[in-house]
């Protein structure tokens, strides 16, 4: 097992929210089958407000050893972004932004929508094929 651990290769990769959404739409990105409970709507709204406020997003981790990537860490954030971009959640009772940001993604000014979907994010992509047990161990380490 130590030999396997030493041979793991996580490659840092920069994305935008738009690129992440495109991977999802193309079914090139999926959540891990056993995930933690997804955030409630209030927590999703706070996260989206943080992104709109320019607060940097924590790194994402992906298993990219196969053409269809699996999210190892960040599925809750990806879920919140997807729901917001597809107008499934509406921002309200904002703490950091003015009332003009209340509402759905489609309600934003085009310049604000562009800025949101072009928000840079950093991901670490595992490029080494690993046994399922080791992937589960990595997942637990990232999420504990």
Over which residues does each language-model region extend?
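Basic- and aromatic-enriched surface patches that contact anionic nucleotides/nucleic acids
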Residues: 2-13, 17-18, 31-144
């Amino acid at each position: 097992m130590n030999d396997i651990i030493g041979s793991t290769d996580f490659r840092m990769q920069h994305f935008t929210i738009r690129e992440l959404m495109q991977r999802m739409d193309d079914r090139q990105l999926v959540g891990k089958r056993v995930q933690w409970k997804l955030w409630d709507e209030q927590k999703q709204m706070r996260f989206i407000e943080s992104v709109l406020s320019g607060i940097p997003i924590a790194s994402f981790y992906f298993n990219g050893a196969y053409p269809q990537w699996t999210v190892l860490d960040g599925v809750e954030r990806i879920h919140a972004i997807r729901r917001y971009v597809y107008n499934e959640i509406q921002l309200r009772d904002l703490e950091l932004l003015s009332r003009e940001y209340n509402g759905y993604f489609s309600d934003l000014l085009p310049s604000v929508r562009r800025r949101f979907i072009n928000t840079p994010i950093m991901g670490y992509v595992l490029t080494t094929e690993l046994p399922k047990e080791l992937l589960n161990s990595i997942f637990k380490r990232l999420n504990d």
